[in-house]
Amino acid sequence: MPLSSETSEMVKQPIRQNRLHKVLHKNLRIPPWVIRPFYRALKITGSPTQYRLRKRLAGEIVAVTKPGMTIPDRAGYRLFGPDDIEGTDRIVRYCETVYQQSRADFPPEYFQKHPHKKFLFPILEGAEFCRHPELLRFMVSRPILDAAAAYLGTVPKLTGARLCWSPENETARSSQLFHFDYEDLRQVKVFMNIFETKEDQGPLTFLPADISHQVQRAIGRVLGRVPDERIYEGGGRNHEVKLIGPPGSGAFLDTSRCLHYGSRCNRRDRVVLIIQFLNCYSAFRPTAPFTVPSDLPGFEPDLVQKLALGID
């Protein structure tokens, strides 16, 4: 059933103010954690009706979300198994097929352009997911979307997705070191193992949010990549959670609050599906944005899913 003109107006995404964010941060060198609250308030002012709608729907979601699919605020993460989200087995098989096909066709020029990158090669990224409606439908299936909305307190926006392959490597650099993601004060990323993942495959490794906060209080604000020794000095030793498990296992993780790293010193291939949800009023501009068509085959999104996908 088509949306009413009033509801359709609510679903429209607020206008991005990224130029202002660039001036404040890049030119005036105001720290991003100072800019974000101001920037968000400005965007909310420009779209108050949608703001209230997203908050109201999130409140309704909290009331009905199963405890096993909620993300504890203190920990900032929730692990899940292959049977916890309906359709996971089908998506794992689909991603395995895409991976096998992509390995044969992976462009050699990518390695030439990125000679120092040895991990997290994108098999699918951004707009490429629009050619795979089954994956898009899964990414905003209500168990996944509701968990993100309940944690963030608002119906979020699907801001990014990647299917990544990490081959054997012996490196420990960049995102293979402990770090935070800085897109917003809070976010939800979903990491799903496509292959069975063990410790020798460079699994996603992270500290719970409360331990990460404790580490920051001890060593000072973490602004980049940090070696293990420094994290351990701050009390992080023996608190690591490693995302190992069978195909379809994974985690909802607030990577803005949980120190994390992954794909370090793989001995075997690792393939992971990564989905990102941010507050619609975040200052972050996706590096690989994509517009979702409103007529995905076999998919009739509800209002919450329309808001997450940015479908009018």
Where are the predicted features?
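Conserved double-stranded beta-helix
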Residues: 2-28, 212-312
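Short, conserved beta-strand element in jelly-roll/cupin
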Residues: 183-199, 244-245, 276-279
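Short, well-ordered beta-to-alpha junction loops that form the rim of enzyme active sites
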Residues: 161-163, 209, 255-257
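Histidine-centered catalytic micro-motifs
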Residues: 176-182, 258-262
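Non-heme Fe(II)-dependent double-stranded beta-helix
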Residues: 14, 27, 31-176
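Active-site region of the double-stranded beta-helix
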Residues: 154-157, 180-183, 192-203, 208-211
